[in-house]
């Protein structure tokens, strides 16, 4: 890691791994539930891109804001958006990050 301008500690690398696993498990759940018809609207999965979002978000501060694409679940999770609120949002339920009105493609957390 001599040439790496962003050397990471073992704890930071472990946290990055945990974040990537959380994203993947979240996406796998959505994939199954969408295939069963349990989710209203459309779902654009982020699976396979976990490292990109995690690596970027771990270098942002709490005050930094992000804007994502229609495949933004991983960005949101890596930035620290509450996973339960995200799941409620995707299912169109109250208590979601946008009170269930944004769905998969319009997850937002302005806090």
Residue ranges of each PLM-predicted region?
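Cofactor-/ligand-binding subdomain signature composed of acidic, glycine-rich
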Residues: 1-40, 62
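Cofactor-binding active-site loop characterized by glycine-rich and histidine/acidic residues
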Residues: 28-32, 38-111
């Amino acid at each position: 890691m001599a040439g790496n301008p962003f050397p990471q500690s073992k704890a930071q690398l472990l946290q990055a791994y945990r974040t990537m696993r959380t994203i993947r498990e979240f996406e796998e759940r959505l994939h199954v539930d969408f295939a069963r018809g349990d989710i209203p609207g459309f779902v654009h999965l982020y699976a396979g891109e976990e490292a990109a979002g995690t690596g970027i978000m771990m270098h942002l501060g709490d005050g930094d804001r992000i804007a994502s694409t229609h495949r933004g679940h991983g960005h949101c999770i890596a930035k620290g958006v509450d996973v339960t609120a995200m799941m409620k949002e995707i299912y169109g339920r109250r208590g979601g990050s946008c009170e269930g009105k944004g769905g998969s493609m319009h997850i937002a957390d302005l806090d």
